[in-house]
């Protein structure tokens, strides 16, 4: 049986964005609380030497809340699983549990959990990937010697080690590592930058590149596309679709899960339920099973009601009483075998943004805007932009990382100012912005109820009204009075959307809003955007959301913005072809060095 979680936490680390010293202390406190607060038990049912893993009677609790109860973990070698479930159901905690072996996973199965960025050092991105590959070769060589000595040359585990060593040929390290890094958005120049000079997002890509290069037996990827632009997303999608070891992905992207996954694991109602096929197959199969389950439920309930009606009509006649007792035994046997349960639907919260008043167009106009962070001509990010935005604008900004998508949103809200030119805004324009570090505004020690109430103290609302406001965004019940720091990132994101709605904006600026949302919540967001009478500008790597809400695709690249002539599907196909060419060219260039 597995030990209590939290006893061996040296490897349990998470990445947080840069904050103040006080915020760091609070973040660390809640991080430690999360990592020490789960307990896991289970019994290994698969062979110790097998690359397949089956663990039965699995129970997982977090802060006393039961996330999994008497369920089975089953991971078959070579399968690619998508782990799905609503925000707060415990997907990331389950990953942590697997990664630190709180469940009895055989030691010969090496696990890589993408949870922290590469360490900042003097080594370049390329060298960092190769360093890990060389360490992996040494580890496998030591393992080879031990297995030969302990199990002999016919060992099952030994064959896998030979295969791994054959694939980790040092003569191919440079071109292979280069191809992966370029696929993840590096150029031949940026991959030669020292990791200490890279941002956290780029160091996370280095960490992902390391995992893809060494190909562990079990790879755990928690929202791997969160730090990627659309080009890197389509490359990773293609790459993982050919991953031939065991892979489990947590992702909010239906497109991504459809392209990559061979199986789906649904974490719901404290159970792990397994489905064959990709996400679309899961939706279809689940719907069919639920229809059949409800038919069986109604049929059984009708049968029980009929039997009970007969028993009630028997009265005191001895022969009828005997028949009644016989009929009661039928019900008793049904209950003993387990009655068919009614389908329990997961709660889906449909939120909305309030109506905004009319404003004369354009509500915002970029007049010959040029921008450079340094102010120097050599560092110009945008040149001579001339753009107009109205209340009916539905725009998706796409383009490579570093092209200036987030910068454009910062210019719009006035966080930064143009180097040249002017941005003219309607005098009554109100904007609400979601960005990738929006969670930093939250007071982790406060409760959602107290925090939202303090942010909008000028609003004359009583406690019940505030509860309803927060509840509309899926933060309900006890969650309203628990510390924000103990909540999942998905719940925190919903709280940010609540704050945005209370601003009553005319224009929504959404920079990667789906990063921590479950699929149902993303669909609710799409509905909220489509019913919102104001304008919307979106930066997202979620192709499905873009297809749901965007009327225009604006490409940010080469210091300007151009409108894409087609839809997001045609742009995705364009990116796929582009990324294939780039990775080939990068691998060839690395061979010539």
UniProtKB/Swiss-Prot annotation:
SUPFAM superfamilies: P-loop containing nucleoside triphosphate hydrolases. It comes from Dictyostelium discoideum. PANTHER family: ATP-BINDING CASSETTE SUB-FAMILY F MEMBER 2, ATP-BINDING TRANSPORT PROTEIN-RELATED. ATP 1 binds at residues 85-92. ATP 2 binds at residues 399-406. Residues 1-10 have a biased composition (Basic residues). Signal peptide: none annotated. This is ABC transporter F family member 2. Gene3D superfamilies: P-loop containing nucleotide triphosphate hydrolases. Residues 1-25 are annotated as: Disordered. InterPro entries: AAA+_ATPase, ABC_tran_Xtn, ABC_transporter-like_ATP-bd, ABC_transporter-like_CS, ABCF_EF3_subfamily, P-loop_NTPase. Belongs to the ABC transporter superfamily. ABCF family. EF3 subfamily. The keyword S-adenosyl-L-methionine does not apply. The lineage of its organism: Eukaryota, Amoebozoa, Evosea, Eumycetozoa, Dictyostelia. Keywords: ATP-binding, Nucleotide-binding, Repeat. GO terms for biological process: aggregation involved in sorocarp development; sorocarp morphogenesis. One of its GO terms (molecular function) is ATP hydrolysis activity. Residues 53-294, 364-583 form the ABC transporter domain. It comes from the Eukaryota.
């Amino acid at each position: 049986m597995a030990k209590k979680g939290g006893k061996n936490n040296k490897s349990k680390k998470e990445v947080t964005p840069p904050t103040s010293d006080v915020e760091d202390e609070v973040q660390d406190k809640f991080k430690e609380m999360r990592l020490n607060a789960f307990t896991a038990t289970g019994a290994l049912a698969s062979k110790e030497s097998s690359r397949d893993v089956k663990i039965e009677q699995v129970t997982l609790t977090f802060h006393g809340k039961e996330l999994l109860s008497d369920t089975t973990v089953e991971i078959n070698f070579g399968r690619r699983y998508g782990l799905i479930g609503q925000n707060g159901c415990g997907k990331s905690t389950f990953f942590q549990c697997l990664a630190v072996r709180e469940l009895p996973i055989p030691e010969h199965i090496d696990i890589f959990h993408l949870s922290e960025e590469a360490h900042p050092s003097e080594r370049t991105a390329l060298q960092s990937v190769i360093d890990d590959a060389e360490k992996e070769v040494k580890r496998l060589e030591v393992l080879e010697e031990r297995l030969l000595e302990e199990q002999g040359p016919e060992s099952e585990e030994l064959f896998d080690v030979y295969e791994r060593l054959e694939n980790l040929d040092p003569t191919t390290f440079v071109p292979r590592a280069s191809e992966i890094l370029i696929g993840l958005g590096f150029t031949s120049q940026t991959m030669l930058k020292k990791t200490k000079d890279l941002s956290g997002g780029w160091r996370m890509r280095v960490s992902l590149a390391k995992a893809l290069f060494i190909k562990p037996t079990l790879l755990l990827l928690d929202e791997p596309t969160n730090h990627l632009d659309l080009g890197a997303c389509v490359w990773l999608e293609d790459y993982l679709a050919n991953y031939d070891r065991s892979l489990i992905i947590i992702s909010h992207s239906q497109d991504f899960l459809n392209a990559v996954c061979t199986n789906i694991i649904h974490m719901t109602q404290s159970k792990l339920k397994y489905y064959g096929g990709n996400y679309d197959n899961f939706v279809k199969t689940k719907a069919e099973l639920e229809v059949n389950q409800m038919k069986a439920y109604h049929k059984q309930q009708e049968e029980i009601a009929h039997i009970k009606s007969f028993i009630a009509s028997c009265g005191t006649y001895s022969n009828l009483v005997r028949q009644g007792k016989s009929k009661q035994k039928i019900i008793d046997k049904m209950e003993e075998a387990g009655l068919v349960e009614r389908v329990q639907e997961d709660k889906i919260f449909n939120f909305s943004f309030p109506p905004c008043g009319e404003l004369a167009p354009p509500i915002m106009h970029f007049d010959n805007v040029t921008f450079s962070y340094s102010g120097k001509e050599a560092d110009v990010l945008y040149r001579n932009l001339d753009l107009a935005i109205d209340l009916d604008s539905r725009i998706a900004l796409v383009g490579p990382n570093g092209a200036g998508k987030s910068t454009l949103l910062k210019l719009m809200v006035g966080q930064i100012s143009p180097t040249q030119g002017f941005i003219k805004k309607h005098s009554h324009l109100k904007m609400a912005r979601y960005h990738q570090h929006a969670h930093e505004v939250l007071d982790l020690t406060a409760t959602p109820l107290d925090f939202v109430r303090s942010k909008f103290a000028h609003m004359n609302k009583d406690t019940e009204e505030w509860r309803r406001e927060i509840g509309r965004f899926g933060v309900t019940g006890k969650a309203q009075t628990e510390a924000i720091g103990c909540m999942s990132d998905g719940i925190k994101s919903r709280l940010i959307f609540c704050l945005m709605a209370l601003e009553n904006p005319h224009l929504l600026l959404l920079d990667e809003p789906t990063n921590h949302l479950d699929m149902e919540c993303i669909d609710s967001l799409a509905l909220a955007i489509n019913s919102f009478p104001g304008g919307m500008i979106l930066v997202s790597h979620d192709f499905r959301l873009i297809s749901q809400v965007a009327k225009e695709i604006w490409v940010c690249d080469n210091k300007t913005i151009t409108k894409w002539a087609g839809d997001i599907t045609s742009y995705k196909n364009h990116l796929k072809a582009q990324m294939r060419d780039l990775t080939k060219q990068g691998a060839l260039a690395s061979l010539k060095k």
